[in-house]
Amino acid sequence: MNEPDGQHVAGYDPDLADQLAAEAADIVRSLGFMAAHIVLIGGLVPGLLVPVLDPGVEPHVGTADIDLCLSVALVEGDTEAYERIETILKGLGFQEGDVSFRWLRHDGIGLTVEFFCPAGEQRPAGRVFRPSHSDNPTGKHNFGGRLSALALEAGELLTTDIEVVSRTFVLPQNKGTIDMELRVTGPLAFLMAKIDALRGRDKPKDAYDIVWLVESWPGGPAVAAASFAQRPAYHRPEVTVALDSIRDAFAATDRIGARSYARFVATDIRDEPQLERRAVGAIAEFVAALPDSN
């Protein structure tokens, strides 16, 4: 699979979404008891959170990789857990990529799996984290030898604001069909991670992911706002900050959010003004319906 760069919708194939979700399920299933400490984040999340679309809503464009976030309990636990993860990955045909949190498999459709963890006092955002012997003197190995995780600013919310999604998956390599549950990061954590990403890199798909989630939520942006506000994490200060940042990023057609959305979706530059207005309108409806979080 050619790795898209997040610049334009043309680089993505929504028909691969189910196949990638099945690959993610296969990896999580292979991790055994550690699966309880792993949450699926990233581009597969919107389609899993909104599996049934209202009439006229286009499917999410999908993604080209699988992003897994390790819980704080796993990150700060026995370093031997990471060796087990690495061993399982190798057994599934993966090898370390250009950085130690990215693992690749070249056969079949080709897969990239990236590992993340919540940022914390000893795990600054944007840095690769790998416990050392001094951090965990009882561990026999140094984070499984090679495997590491990239710390994300969204923090612990990524693994506490979660949804357990039940789906039927057709596992790869003719392993059969299985009904199983995936732990998926919830909508508030997803929005928080995406607005952090939008502000920190030039990947227009981040804006698309934000708009698609609130616009495609069953019932539309206002219903999304009411639904998200019912989540326990809604009143956390970092969520309030993230939602304010989303409001600002889409406050006008020339703001970074609206421009990024239009750049990603437009097939003709003449369509960009209309797409900018669409993004501004969707987010305006969403934030207007959000109740006071104080």
Pin down the residues of each PLM region.
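Compositionally biased terminal segments of proteins
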Residues: 1-294
